[in-house]
Regions:
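Generic, low-specificity signal for short hydrophobic/alpha-helical stretches with a mild N-terminal bias
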Residues: 18, 29, 38-40, 46, ...
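Extracellular/lumenal/periplasmic "stalk" regions immediately C-terminal to a signal peptide or transmembrane helix
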Residues: 1-48, 74
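Periplasmic peptidoglycan-binding/anchoring modules of Gram-negative envelope and division proteins
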Residues: 29-46, 56, 67-97, 101, ...
């Protein structure tokens, strides 16, 4: 006798194909750059990365007169915008002052570039923290002339080295 053919299993109904649309991911650095777009376009402020940190680098030309640690009043709206950008981001905030390698004048209230860099970081901290929801997130540091980003042998290089960095950890490191 011939065996009966096996019962045919009905196939499941066809599932419509859904095309996956790749939605671009807005990264943390993109959010910060967007929040500071006007300041970046105006010059003197950049947003980049350094190791596990996102760094808002502020040129000294926006901040201080040569050899001074008293903020220029025109930095106030920039400080407010930096605080607004960072209010939306998690984690601690470090404000780090940097100088060129030109020693402070003997008449200066600052005995070293390290002292000047710390005083400048504290001045930026005071203005930015004033605008933050949680000012306790902020710590300051000064590096003096120890972390140049350009050649101190040229005027342009020295100008680039005079800066304050506002740093936050990349969110994936928290």
């Amino acid at each position: 006798a011939v065996a009966a053919p096996p019962e045919a299993t009905p196939s499941p109904p066809a599932v419509p194909t859904v095309t996956q649309i790749d939605v671009p991911t807005i990264t943390q650095i993109d959010r910060i750059r967007a929040a500071l777009a006007n300041e970046i376009a105006g010059g003197g402020l950049t947003v980049g990365t350094k190791g596990n940190f996102i760094v808002v680098e502020i040129s000294n030309q926006l901040l201080f007169a040569p050899g001074q640690a008293e903020l220029k009043p025109e930095f106030q709206p920039i400080a407010a915008d930096i605080a607004t950008a960072l209010n939306a981001e998690p984690g601690p905030i470090w404000i780090v002052g940097h100088t060129d390698n030109v020693k402070p004048k003997k008449s200066s209230q600052f005995k070293s570039n390290f002292d000047l860099s710390v005083a400048r970081a504290k001045a930026v901290q005071a203005m930015v923290a004033n605008e933050l929801k949680d000012p306790s997130r902020v710590a300051v540091d000064g590096k003096g002339e120890d972390e140049p980003i350009a050649d101190n042998a040229t005027a342009d290089g020295r100008a680039k080295n005079r800066r304050v960095d506002v740093m936050i950890p990349k969110e994936e490191t928290l």
